């Protein structure tokens, strides 16, 4: 193909498209040099610790984990003994209950590496050449710009997992957000109690209760598995987990699929001990001791996220995933998953600003555009929220706003407020009775927030303080959504100032939450009209042909969760396309095949490429004639290669449908067949009719808007539509375990004639005083929990208790290594109790 490109006419066309010049081979200009990261100066614990100390970042005195002891699974999980007998669970589990201990270490892979660039993260040069070839074969007006953008993306981006320097600099940046120009503030410091936050969340994240069949929050995790040996009746109510994801501490280097039994043993033991703390003479001290014994359940592995990073920032910006210990993830998910799975309520189907559960397909993006046009016609402000993303339409201008390093703005009290909302609105029956017991209320309100917010992380052999919440924990989305809700509520209170104004930016200091304006689209009405008027007359979703439009449809670039909207003449509605910047980056750099089990199959790499090219076409490549033509050619070519190998293409690809990086966005959409216009019709045709005025109100506080609730909270006039029983129940979750026991009488219902808190009797007023006292105890208990989960800063790097650190570039297994065992340690009370219980189980 090089000879074709270097013919005088073609060479001139290519150089003209790239806006470059050369006297030599055109491919020297067309194909950027492979990026090789610089040598990482912080790839050893000594260098990393010195760097962190220089920047006054908190390094914790290391804690050791008891060595693993092998025990019988049926003794540790007696209710699941039948699963062991039937081979559903392994016979032995390894739990940290030894009499010696080790210091954990975690060395993640960083690829590409300076010493070995390898093939991981390599750009798709073959597709780049195909784009160039079809540029020469066709006269697409936007072809030269597309080729230039893809080539520039290859030259300036790099897919990979960053570097130690990038990870450590990210930690510093997170700390800077939390403690810098706008130090973090708790909801109460901003002016919101947990109950007031719950009222706001009723508007911004409406929810449905769990299914009636879902077990209450009263059980240890292993009790959520109902096993009889009959597949027709067997049932597991455990939250869904990704089996191939990391198990976290204390099982470094293993996956969740490898350690399911171990996670159940530890989670059961932890929640059981927490329950016993409730009935002890000193519940606070007992709970603190439990947290100390299980300290590793609050320490996440600092995992570098694979992304398309900017080459120039390779050593400055690596996104960190706080890889939670499996038992911690399991317990938190038991609180959140049963509810969120039933609560896909968003602005397209409910009167709420929430975008949770939103899909741009099947008319989703058109519903958004309909709502936007309705507000433009009525000259009304519009706001939407999804996690740390806020979208505002005001004065014919569209604003896309992101919380700056959203997780860094979180405090334990933010998560406590979210837990309060979960318990009082979700895990509660219609009659006001709770679907949880004191143990789970304590875990949710007292322990859980301290385990994942302002907790600790492990990188190399360094145990470090984390600022804000760990990214990727089971409550990351929920906590971010709550913080965005606070920003929007304060925006309403301030009179809805223009997002580009000083008054709007002053909300940062008021809320303690940093944010930035990512996009401003002025004169949105004209942009929408132009998109409709200039929509393509030919090609996909226009005349019904199986060809791309010669000129792409003009996109309304909302940046709505990464999606834009283009108008389809055939459907007479807007359809989604991926934001152009994201699309170009996806074309330039494949993420590669990461599923190890599928990677071993013959034809695996070819299958991945087929799915990749079909996904590129479906998410918006179909609207770009050059990308669509090249991706279609590549997909068909790879299919032929599979057929030559004698593999049934359609059946083989069924397992690969979720292998695309857009699997979450394309849920329920097949990538196994070549894309046609009918494919686009099938995935974009609305499943139901939509009338913006027919959207039902939120399940709670019907008839209220976020603005009205905010105003009512500010003025103090808001009345809860539920009875005083609800009021008392709401307060119940504020209690520490000891207060639940000592002041249980404060939770009896109000008189049946009383409908509102304000109408309650003197008895209720007295009870409220007790509850306020309990709330003060809870505030201090959050601090106690954090103290139980960390130690004071160490003035020196770990030395003498671990072997010399391995070079992660040359070690046989650089991902995981254990340090030398420390001195003997006494058995903890938990270990002693577990041993007695298991011995009793054996005798029985």
Curated annotation (Swiss-Prot):
It is found in: Virion. It comes from the Viruses. It catalyses: RNA(n) + a ribonucleoside 5'-triphosphate = RNA(n+1) + diphosphate. InterPro entries: Birnavirus_RdRp_C, Birnavirus_RdRp_palm, Birnavirus_RdRp_palm_sf, Birnavirus_RdRp_thumb, Birnavirus_RdRp_thumb_sf, DNA/RNA_pol_sf. It is an enzyme of class 2 (transferase). Keywords: Covalent protein-RNA linkage, GTP-binding, Nucleotide-binding, Nucleotidyltransferase, Phosphoprotein, RNA-directed RNA polymerase, Transferase, Viral RNA replication, Virion. GTP binds at residues 248-255. One of its GO terms (molecular function) is GTP binding. The keyword Membrane does not apply. One of its GO terms (cellular component) is virion component. It holds the Pfam family Birna_RdRp_C. Residues 384-588 form the RdRp catalytic domain. Its EC number is 2.7.7.48. One of its GO terms (biological process) is viral genome replication. Residues 820-844 are annotated as: Disordered. Exists in multiple phosphorylated forms. Residues 833-844 have a biased composition (Basic residues). RNA-dependent RNA polymerase which is found both free and covalently attached to the genomic RNA. May also contain guanylyl and methyl transferase activities. Interacts with VP3 in the cytoplasm. This is RNA-directed RNA polymerase. It comes from Infectious pancreatic necrosis virus (strain Sp) (IPNV).
């Amino acid at each position: 193909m090089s000879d074709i490109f270097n013919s005088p006419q073609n060479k001139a066309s290519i150089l003209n498209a790239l806006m470059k010049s050369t006297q030599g081979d055109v491919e020297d200009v067309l194909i950027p040099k492979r990026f090789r990261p610089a040598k990482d100066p912080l790839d050893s614990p000594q260098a990393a610790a010195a760097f962190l100390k220089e920047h006054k970042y908190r390094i914790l005195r290391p804690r050791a984990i008891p060595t693993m002891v092998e025990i019988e699974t049926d003794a540790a999980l007696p209710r699941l003994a039948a699963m062991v007998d039937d081979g559903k669970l392994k016979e032995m589990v390894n739990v940290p209950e030894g009499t010696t201990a080790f210091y954990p270490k975690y060395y993640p892979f960083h690829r590409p590496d300076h010493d070995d660039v390898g093939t991981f993260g390599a750009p798709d040069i073959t597709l780049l050449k195909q784009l160039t070839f079809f540029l020469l074969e066709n006269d697409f007006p936007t072809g030269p710009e597309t080729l230039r953008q893809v080539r520039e993306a290859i030259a300036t981006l790099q897919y990979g997992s960053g570097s130690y320097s990038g990870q450590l600099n990210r930690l510093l940046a997170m700390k800077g957000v939390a403690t810098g120009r706008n130090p973090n503030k708790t909801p109460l410091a901003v002016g919101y109690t947990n109950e007031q936050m719950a009222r706001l969340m009723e508007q911004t994240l409406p929810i449905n209760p769990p299914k009636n069949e879902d077990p209450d929050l009263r059980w240890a995790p292993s009790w959520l598995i109902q096993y009889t040996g009959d597949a027709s009746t067997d049932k597991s109510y455990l939250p869904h987990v990704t089996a191939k994801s990391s198990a976290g501490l204390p099982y470094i280097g293993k996956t969740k699929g490898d350690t399911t039994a171990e996670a159940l043993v530890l989670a059961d033991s932890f929640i059981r001990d927490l329950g016993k703390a409730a009935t002890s003479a000193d519940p606070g001290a007992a709970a603190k001791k439990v947290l100390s014994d299980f300290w590793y359940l609050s320490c996440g592995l600092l995992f570098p996220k694979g992304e398309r990073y900017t080459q120039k920032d390779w050593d400055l910006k690596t996104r960190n995933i706080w890889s939670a210990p499996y038992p911690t993830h399991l317990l938190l998910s038991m609180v959140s998953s049963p509810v969120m799975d039933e609560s896909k309520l968003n602005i397209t189907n409910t009167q709420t600003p929430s975008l949770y559960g939103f899909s741009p397909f099947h008319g989703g993006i058109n519903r958004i555009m309909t709502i936007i046009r309705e507000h433009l016609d009525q000259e009304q402000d519009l706001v939407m929220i999804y996690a740390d993303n806020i979208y505002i339409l005001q004065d014919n201008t569209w604003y896309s706003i992101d919380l700056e390093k959203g997780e860094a703005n979180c405090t334990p009290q933010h998560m406590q407020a979210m837990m309060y909302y979960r318990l009082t609105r979700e895990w509660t029956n219609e009659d006001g009775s709770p679907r949880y017991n004191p143990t789970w209320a304590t875990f949710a309100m007292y322990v859980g927030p301290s385990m994942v917010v302002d907790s600790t992380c492990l990188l190399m052999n360094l145990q470090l303080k984390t600022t804000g919440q760990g990214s990727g924990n089971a409550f990351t989305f929920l906590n971010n959504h709550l913080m965005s809700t606070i920003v929007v509520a304060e925006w309403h209170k301030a009179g809805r100032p223009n997002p580009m104004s000083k008054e709007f930016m002053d909300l940062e200091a008021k809320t303690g939450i940093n944010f930035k304006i990512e996009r401003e689209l002025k004169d949105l009405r004209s942009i929408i009209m132009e998109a409709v008027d200039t929509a393509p007359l030919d090609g996909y979703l226009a005349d019904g042909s199986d060809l791309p439009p010669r000129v792409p449809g003009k996109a309304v670039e909302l940046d709505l969760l990464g999606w834009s909207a283009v108008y389809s003449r055939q459907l007479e509605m807007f359809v989604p396309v991926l934001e152009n910047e994201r699309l170009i980056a996806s074309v330039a750099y494949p993420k590669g095949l990461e599923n190890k089990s599928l990677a071993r199959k013959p034809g695996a790499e070819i299958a991945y490429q087929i799915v990749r090219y079909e996904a590129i076409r479906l998410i918006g490549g179909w609207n770009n004639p050059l990308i669509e033509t090249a991706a279609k050619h590549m997909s068909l070519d790879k299919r032929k290669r599979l057929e030559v190998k004698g593999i049934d293409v359609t059946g083989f690809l069924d397992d690969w449908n979720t292998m695309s990086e857009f699997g979450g966005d394309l849920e329920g959409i097949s990538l196994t067949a070549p894309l046609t216009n009918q494919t686009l019709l099938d995935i974009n045709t609305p499943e139901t009719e939509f009338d913006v005025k027919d959207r039902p109100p939120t399940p709670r506080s019907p008839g209220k808007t976020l603005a009205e609730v905010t105003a009512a909270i500010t003025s103090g006039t808001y009345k809860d539509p539920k009875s005083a029983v609800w009021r008392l129940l709401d307060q119940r979750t504020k209690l520490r375990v000891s207060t639940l026991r000592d002041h249980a009488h404060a939770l009896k219902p109000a008189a049946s004639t009383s409908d509102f808190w304000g109408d309650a009797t003197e008895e209720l007023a007295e009870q409220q005083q007790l509850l306020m006292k309990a709330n003060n105890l809870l505030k201090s208990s959050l601090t106690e929990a954090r103290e139980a989960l960390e130690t004071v800063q160490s003035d020196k790097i770990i030395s003498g208790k671990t072997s010399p650190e391995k070079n992660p570039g040359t070690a046989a297994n650089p991902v995981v290594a254990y340090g030398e065992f420390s001195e003997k340690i006494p058995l903890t009370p938990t270990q002693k109790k577990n041993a007695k219980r298991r011995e009793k189980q054996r005798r029985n």
